[in-house]
Swiss-Prot record:
It comes from the Eukaryota. The keyword Zinc applies. A zinc finger (C2H2-type) spans 55-79. It comes from Homo sapiens. The keyword Metal-binding applies. This is Zinc finger protein 804B. Keywords: Metal-binding, Zinc, Zinc-finger. Residues 985-1010 are annotated as: Disordered. GO terms for cellular component: nucleus. GO terms for molecular function: zinc ion binding. InterPro entries: ZnF-G_patch_domain, Znf_C2H2_sf, Znf_C2H2_type.
Amino acid sequence: MACYLVISSRHLSNGHYRGIKGVFRGPLCKNGSPSPDFAEKKSTAKALEDVKANFYCELCDKQYHKHQEFDNHINSYDHAHKQRLKELKQREFARNVASKSWKDEKKQEKALKRLHQLAELRQQSECVSGNGPAYKAPRVAIEKQLQQGIFPIKNGRKVSCMKSALLLKGKNLPRIISDKQRSTMPNRHQLQSDRRCLFGNQVLQTSSDLSNANHRTGVSFTFSKKVHLKLESSASVFSENTEETHDCNKSPIYKTKQTADKCKCCRFANKDTHLTKEKEVNISPSHLESVLHNTISINSKILQDKHDSIDETLEDSIGIHASFSKSNIHLSDVDFTPTSREKETRNTLKNTLENCVNHPCQANASFSPPNIYNHSDARISECLDEFSSLEPSEQKSTVHLNPNSRIENREKSLDKTERVSKNVQRLVKEACTHNVASKPLPFLHVQSKDGHTTLQWPTELLLFTKTEPCISYGCNPLYFDFKLSRNTKEDHNLEDLKTELGKKPLELKTKRESQVSGLTEDQQKLIQEDYQYPKPKTMIANPDWEKFQRKYNLDYSDSEPNKSEYTFSANDLEMKNPKVPLYLNTSLKDCAGKNNSSENKLKEASRAHWQGCRKAVLNDIDEDLSFPSYISRFKKHKLIPCSPHLEFEDERQFNCKSSPCTVGGHSDHGKDFSVILKSNHISMTSKVSGCGNQRYKRYSPQSCLSRYSSSLDTSPSSMSSLRSTCSSHRFNGNSRGNLLCFHKREHHSVERHKRKCLKHNCFYLSDDITKSSQMQSEPQKERNCKLWESFKNEKYSKRRYCHCRERQKLGKNQQQFSGLKSTRIIYCDSNSQISCTGSSKKPPNCQGTQHDRLDSYSIEKMYYLNKSKRNQESLGSPHICDLGKVRPMKCNSGNISCLLKNCSSGPSETTESNTAEGERTPLTAKILLERVQAKKCQEQSSNVEISSNSCKSELEAPSQVPCTIQLAPSGCNRQALPLSEKIQYASESRNDQDSAIPRTTEKDKSKSSHTNNFTILADTDCDNHLSKGIIHLVTESQSLNIKRDATTKEQSKPLISEIQPFIQSCDPVPNEFPGAFPSNKYTGVTDSTETQEDQINLDLQDVSMHINHVEGNINSYYDRTMQKPDKVEDGLEMCHKSISPPLIQQPITFSPDEIDKYKILQLQAQQHMQKQLLSKHLRVLPAAGPTAFSPASTVQTVPVHQHTSITTIHHTFLQHFAVSASLSSHSSHLPIAHLHPLSQAHFSPISFSTLTPTIIPAHPTFLAGHPLHLVAATPFHPSHITLQPLPPTAFIPTLFGPHLNPATTSIIHLNPLIQPVFQGQDFCHHSCSSQMQQLNEVKEALNVSTHLN
């Protein structure tokens, strides 16, 4: 029977949906054989299944039986939608996966990048503390290792390599970097200096080792990835927690470098003499050139080479110290590279010793010149003195231009260093033993304002006051100018060195004597090499090291008069480029840049000069303690600054105004000074090479010497340095002359520092300190080498005011006018030794001293006069040579004498500068009167004489006020002056350019006038930068008014412009300027037409300045300023820049961009306000009559002088405006002439507390030019002081009541509207009584002027 089988499977064998059920009928064969039709059925079913399978949609999971149905489905929206969704899901999934993986990768990359950045920041912060960008990573790593005492003793090679790589870039350090080395690490520079001495037993390295070291060019070393110290961003305000940390903050390598520098001398003298000679022979001039080109890399290599040989010898000694010592020795050994390498070595040794001393005695300010750092041990100081003497001798031998002589000199110096090294060994051993615990750190532990949080602050961000106890203050690193801080540190170190050198004059003298000839040629050669090549930026990395280098750069400068002097000043100015070897920077950037063609000539001249000056230098060595290598010129220069006896000599010179050769009061002053003149002459030449008046300055060094000595003689201390400066500056008219002057002034600045008058860099200016200052200033000089030529005004303004960069910019501008400004700075120097150095040293001083800036102005003014006199070839007069040349010498002598005397009594620098300025200003008034009345053609001689007398009178009367102003904020308002200086400089630049024909008496006179103006500005700078600007403007206004006296119409315009600026900027500033406050506004206010004419006719004005000496001068300045309103505004902006932060201590500085923006904003706001006020004033002014200020000039004035500090300027201007108005009302023909008649009798000397300096701007004391003993204990901030508005009736009516025109009265009444805020002034002294007194004095002055009219 057939079975019926129902197949229920819904799917085919292939998995396709079957959808049909087949019923198979038929008998089932028992045998299983299929029925006959089974095959057919099977095939049919299979075909159906296949067909149906073809109609199955997997995506939609649908089975279609018909082809058309299937096609319809495939084309349907549902099917397409599902397809899209499927694809989208797939894509999204893939995207998600990819994005996730990408994000993960990015996160990883970000994390890695962040880690790298952190590591970089840590290294940089450590490097900053180490002051060595060239050695950032190595310093960080090595400092950590040194501090932790982790010194791989793998034969001392690893550590040696590390330290060598850091300091010497691949130099193998001594293999013995064991616990001894660790112990000595804190006293690294000591150990470095004594490495040979202390570890003489360790210097077991044989000559084979030495040869091996020479062959070991490559070294393998590793730096720890972790940074030992990290700068905490939260540390914005802090107090010094530990002094030891400050000592440690210098990177151990840095200190080691210092120590090595010192040790170099010792080892070089003892064991490395042969090595040194060998290395001298081995190293080729091309190598030197390469070293000069790459001071960091090549110096490191040279140090490496020397290290290799010296390392082998000293390998047993402390590895790092030996390495530094070797590198230092190597530097000195390499004659062709003595400048950069020796400087580097000296700086390294200096830093090393300094650091060693720093740990034990961070607060100790007396440090031998090698130890530029303030903190030092007596023993270390001795060692440093020895080292400095040895090192300078070494350097001098290195300086020898002839390799043979260099080698011989080095041999001699090595002998000396051997002797010294023994002492140093003892001293260093003791010091190291005592100071092993302290280790150099890149940071100081400081306390945050909360009082309990200890922050690690970079050493570079810390500045220490010179007072005892030392107070450290810092600023936000974001706004911190590290180069500037280095400069400041160097200045402090220079002061210490100065003191130390004063202590050890005999040692240094003897050593220098033996070293002068030795280093001369080598240093000259090195200087020339450096001069030829771009300045390496390695040397300046460490401020101490730079200081050390600078000291020896000064030596080098002496060796190479042009380059050396230039280098010195450039280095001083080069503080801005602390990473470049000081002397290298100066000579290379400025001299090489400017006088590459004349380089060889300068070099030759330097060699000849050095050879000719060696004897003088040797003589100077006896007298000059700290400048063994500064050969005669610097010796002489330094001799004067040699703190103890030099100060005395300076005083003595002040008494003996006439002996130019007795500048330092030293036995060899004549000879040395004449040599110095030659040196300065050459140096100035090389420095002026860029300016194009190199030869002009060369001819004048001797004459300048006379002037210099005369100016030095004028004042007890200040005069001495002034004369040095004057001779150097005048004959050089360049940074070199400034350098010389600066050294003397440095010495005097020590004096002043003692007087508390100059607590800043001035104090460093003792001989050794001068050296150190030069060393640290050399970067400044290098940066501002051009400034040296023209930085007098601008450098100070910028340097003091804000930044080395500003200063450098100014320097660039001022370079063109270096000669003129140098002379003026010389007179400033007479006013104040530090300022006296011209701007050469002032850049560093600017940081610390407003007096310096003021002096810089004065000196610049003097320099203008000097230049004019030089042009007249009246260089015979000692002190007043330059002024005397253009004008009767007595004018300058009197002015400078007055200045010096005033300065000597009080803040000599400020008073002198003010006095000189004041003298010139009244002189101008008198001259203008004479010229206007008599219209005599004796412009040159008459102007000179009249200027001399008038300057004195003016100094007594109007300038006394500036003096007062200047003295008041002597420590506070540095920045204000620089801007004024900038403006003045701008005008002065024009003046100088116009007086590119310096011989032209007219130009000289105009320069003289400008000088006076600047002096006044400098004066005000101390008190208020605004005051400064005002005084400066007053002087110029007086000169303008006087000049316009010839034409009543012109006078009326100037008066209007003059008075208007006062109206605009005259907030009640009772103490600022009693009667005449020249205002930068005034410059702007000056008749645009007239000003433009004056500017356009600047040269003519220079000529007419003979007729209108002061007026012409001021006019030329103002006219130039007015001629180019943009320039005037720029200048005013600069003034504002300097004025706005003047009272704030420089250490707290903002970036130049921030300062500019801030100042611009303030200027705009104040200009707007003043425009409104001026519009009101102008409305009233017409009633004043013809003498009233013209609206045009007033309008001009307003925009010119708006600034944050303008309120102060306004106050001063209002006063000056009222005075001018009264004067103009009384006599339109000579409005300013009335001011100058004021005599000192009108102003009684007033002494103020430390806070009063800011308040005193208008005090009679300042007006009288009496020295005020004002010391700013703390930086003054604008918030600290707000001038109390005086009742218009109380202030102005009393002062101007009888003399004021209606317009003037109205303007004066507007004064209260402007509330002068003296950033650094304390109003306790700005009492109504003092204001009334000042008003009365101004009244008297006005009366006198009226009588004169």
